[in-house]
Amino acid sequence: MEYEHITHSFEPVYDENSRILILGTLPSVASRENNFYYGHKQNRFWKLLAYLLDEPVPETIDEKKYMLFKNHIAIWDVIQSCDIKGSSDNSIKNVRPTDIRKILETSDIKQIYVNGNKAGALYKKYQLPLTGMEAVTLPSTSPANAAWSFERLCEAWSRILVNL
């Protein structure tokens, strides 16, 4: 598989009431095809959030945004553009990071969480020096992270509820 240069095509989802910010790396191939975050049918992000928030699992983009806003959750990614092979985070190179400072300046973010180790490492390298705000790395909801059962993910991710 060849490297492809990808530029992030989604706006961040947040408002002035957002209390936590969840950052991924960048949209997967399936997410880009579906025009929204965590679009791969086997990614457990939306099912996990719905379970933790005691909400129905959102199906449409509008339902996903509604659940995020209702629960004061912002989402975006750490990468604005990069070279990548398919959806493999391990292949990411030539990173241009997003600038999350506007979100932090115009919302009520209490804590930043990153979805997976690669997002955590990139946050630490690129965003932490700009924001001074430590991020909590959570296990990836990606189907590639099959070692983590849904139950284990729920337990690990339940820490986001403290800041909601």
Each predicted region: which residue ranges?
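Short catalytic/ligand-binding loop motif for oxyanion handling, primarily in non-cytosolic enzymes
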Residues: V29-R32, D83-G86, G120-Y123, P143-A147
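Internal catalytic-core helix/loop-beta-alpha segment
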Residues: K70-K118
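A general structural signal for short secondary-structure boundary/capping elements
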Residues: Y66-N71, K118-Y126
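Short loop/turn segments at strand-loop or loop-helix junctions that form parts
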Residues: T25, V78-Q80, S140
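Short, hydrophobic/glycine-enriched beta-strand segments
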Residues: R19-T25
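C-terminal capping/extension of enzyme domains
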Residues: M1-R19, K41, S88-P97, R101, ...
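Short, surface-exposed acidic-centric catalytic microdomains
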Residues: A30-S91
